[in-house]
């Protein structure tokens, strides 16, 4: 079920991006959204790595 929801979400996002990208003024907005998404992903990865390190340190 989660896979289906993820697929549908990605499909909708790609559909919206294809419609929006036809408008030149939205190009800057799309780049900003992508930049924010990348920052959020890096932050999430850093938190996950720190959590893993803390678990390893606590386990020993």
From Swiss-Prot:
Main location: secreted
Gene Ontology molecular functions: toxin activity
GO cellular component: extracellular region
Subcellular location: Secreted
Alphabetized UniProt keyword annotations: Antibiotic, Antimicrobial, Fungicide, Secreted, Signal, Toxin
Domain of life (superkingdom): Eukaryota
Any GO BP annotation: defense response to bacterium
UniProt note on tissues of expression: Expressed by the venom secretory cell of the spine. The spine is a cuticular structure containing a single large nucleated venom-secreting cell at its base. It is an independent unit capable of producing, storing and injecting venom. On the back of D.vulnerans caterpillars, spines are grouped together by 50 to 100 to form scoli, of which there are eight in D.vulnerans.
Function text: Peptide that induces pain in mammals and has insecticidal, antimicrobial and antiparasitic activities. Induces irreversible paralysis in D.melanogaster when tested at high doses. Shows a moderate antiparasitic activity against the major pathogenic nematode of ruminants (H.contortus, EC(50)=24.5 uM). Has moderate to potent antimicrobial activities against all Gram-positive and -negative bacteria tested, and against the fungus C.neoformans (var. grubii), but has no activity against the fungus C.albicans.
Similarity section: Belongs to the limacoditoxin-2 (cecropin-like) family.
Name under which the protein is recorded: DELTA-limacoditoxin(2)-Dv12
Organism in which the protein naturally occurs: Doratifera vulnerans
């Amino acid at each position: 079920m989660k896979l289906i929801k993820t697929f549908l979400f990605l499909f909708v996002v790609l559909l919206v991006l294809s419609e929006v990208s036809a408008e030149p003024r939205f190009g800057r907005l799309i780049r900003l959204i992508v930049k924010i998404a990348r920052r959020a992903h890096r932050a999430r990865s850093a938190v996950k790595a720190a959590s893993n390190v803390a678990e390893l340190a606590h386990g020993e």
